[in-house]
Amino acid sequence: MSISKSLVLNEIKKFSPSHIIIGYSGGVDSSVLLNISKELDIPLIAIYINHNLHRDSLKWQIHCQQTCQKYNLQFISHSLDKVPKGESFEAWASKQRMAFFQKIMQQYSKPLLLLGHHQDDQAETFLIQAIRGSGLAGLAGIPHYKELHHGGVLRPLLKYSKIEIEGFAKLNNISYIYDDSNEDIKYRRNLIRNQIIPILQQVNPNISQTLSRSANICAESNNILQKLLTERLQSISQDTNLIISELIKLDDDIQKNLLHLWFKQNTQQSLKSKQIKELHLAVNNPSTGWQIDISNYYQIHIQYNQLIIKYPTTINDISKEDIISWLSKNLNEEIDLTKIVIRDRKPDDKCKYRGRNKPNKLKILFQELQIPTTERSKAKIILKDQQIIAVYPFFICG
């Protein structure tokens, strides 16, 4: 199957974006995507993320910049810091890239982020998730489209193979760079791409297409499952708390899936299999006062007949005087202490940051400002007249 430029363009136009943001590495995938997308009468911004790992990374950045100048497209480059010690580079870099993309997207009314993932990427991701022992959500792989907090991300080339993309580039004389670090098998994805996939192709020459189809089936099944679970979760919840007596009426497998969904909906984080098993055991033998630390940030408690998410730190751990002193220094107005409320952060808390037109979830702001996860647990929410006016010790809202 050859790439249909008209189909790709029509798919992008279907979302009626105000602006198009392209993750542009200079490789063949993003170069083809840029070449096609530039034909749209929609403002386009190409973003190059410099990982500072390869000797030629600056040359690649210049290549991308010159290509954008040639087509009169806006170009933005962003340089990543060194990966924190002990973290996986692949996972860390992916989070950093997406955080920067979303930071740029916040500037526009209805942005659409385009990424150049293709069928072979999907097949590799399926294998990576299978090796990890992932469930349906993981095996679903890379989503074709995903709604973001502000805008969405679309992968128009996901149904096309790498060979088809390279063929399109050759046919249309599209210049692109080649990253020889893609051959380095110390990275798991490269090992799968360069050694495992070729072996599987001996069994099934169309293995990438087959695995991609399996990922799509898993995605469809997971979507159905999540809708059914969400409906059931609503019937056994009270605000953000889970009613234990209603939960334990259900089959064990449904209980475990609901525990995972409940925690993720309220924290945007996933429970590990071991934690789900421990929680499942606890709710079926409930004891008021039981608790488990999920991370440095969250705890889950049993209180009477409810499962409750709490935060390990409390206001007493930080001097209220310190918080008020910080607020006085940073807020350019008189403070009526009788109207000030200080509490822990909640998952849905939002803040209108530095003159923005509308508020953003704190999780998004923490990512944009690159506040380490380990530091976020210190956050205290300061309210006045039931409105968030500051997040101690990080920033003022409004």
From Swiss-Prot:
Q: Where does ATP bind?
A: S25, G26, G27, V28, D29, S30
Q: Which GO cellular component term is one of those annotated?
A: cytoplasm
Question: Among its keywords, does the record have Membrane?
Answer: no
Q: What HAMAP family does this protein map onto?
A: tRNA_Ile_lys_synt (MF_01161)
Location(s) in or outside the cell: Cytoplasm
Recorded hits in InterPro entries, A to Z, give:
Lysidine-tRNA-synth_C, Rossmann-like_a/b/a_fold, TilS/TtcA_N, tRNA_Ile_lys_synt, tRNA_Ile_lys_synt_N, tRNA_Ile_lys_synt_subst-bd
Q: Which family does it belong to?
A: Belongs to the tRNA(Ile)-lysidine synthase family.
Domain of life, per UniProt, equals Bacteria
Q: Which NCBIfam families match?
A: lysidine_TilS_C (TIGR02433), lysidine_TilS_N (TIGR02432)
Q: Which CDD domains does UniProt cross-reference here?
A: TilS_N
Q: Which UniProt keywords apply?
A: ATP-binding, Cytoplasm, Ligase, Nucleotide-binding, tRNA processing
> Which GO BP terms, alphabetically?
tRNA modification
Instruction: Please describe what this protein does.
Output: Ligates lysine onto the cytidine present at position 34 of the AUA codon-specific tRNA(Ile) that contains the anticodon CAU, in an ATP-dependent manner. Cytidine is converted to lysidine, thus changing the amino acid specificity of the tRNA from methionine to isoleucine.
Q: What is known of its domains?
A: The N-terminal region contains the highly conserved SGGXDS motif, predicted to be a P-loop motif involved in ATP binding.
Molecular function via GO: ATP binding; tRNA(Ile)-lysidine synthase activity
Q: Does the keyword Acetylation apply?
A: no
Q: What is this protein called?
A: tRNA(Ile)-lysidine synthase
User: Which reaction(s) does its UniProt entry say it catalyses?
Assistant: cytidine(34) in tRNA(Ile2) + L-lysine + ATP = lysidine(34) in tRNA(Ile2) + AMP + diphosphate + H(+)
- Give the enzyme's EC designation: 6.3.4.19
